[in-house]
Amino acid sequence: MISDKIKLTAKDILEKEFKTGMRGYQQEEVDKFLDMIIKDYEAFHKEFEQLKQQNARLKRELEEQKLAATQVPQQPVVQTPVAQPVYNNTNTDILKRLSNLEKAVFGSKLYE
């Protein structure tokens, strides 16, 4: 985990003492810089904790969704019948129409 890789805490940075020499760093400048680092470090730590909580929450929600999905009863897929042409009625209608047309065109000559 990332927590194992972090070696310093904000408190460690705050309490760090630097040795000063005759021509060493200006102590005030180092303190100001360390204060900025501490603030950033605390902000990163806070963000990290929030992300860990969010990650745990999302994992729980995912597990709940998986569990709910397995518990949903499987409903059979109902296929709607495809409209099939009705040949019997169509053929009968065509034959009747043809007969009527023949009677109209040829009259009674056809049936004599």
From Swiss-Prot:
Subunit comment: Forms polymers through the coiled coil domains. Interacts with PBP1, MreC and EzrA.
Protein function: Divisome component that associates with the complex late in its assembly, after the Z-ring is formed, and is dependent on DivIC and PBP2B for its recruitment to the divisome. Together with EzrA, is a key component of the system that regulates PBP1 localization during cell cycle progression. Its main role could be the removal of PBP1 from the cell pole after pole maturation is completed. Also contributes to the recruitment of PBP1 to the division complex. Not essential for septum formation.
HAMAP family: GpsB
Gene: gpsB
Coiled-coil segments on the chain, per record: 38-72
Keywords, in A-Z order: Cell cycle, Cell division, Cell shape, Coiled coil, Cytoplasm
Family: Belongs to the GpsB family.
Gene Ontology CC annotations of this record: cytoplasm
Pfam families: DivIVA (PF05103)
Name recorded for this polypeptide: Cell cycle protein GpsB
Subcellular location: Cytoplasm
GO biological process, one term: regulation of cell shape
Cysteines paired by S-S bonds: none
Membrane-spanning parts: none
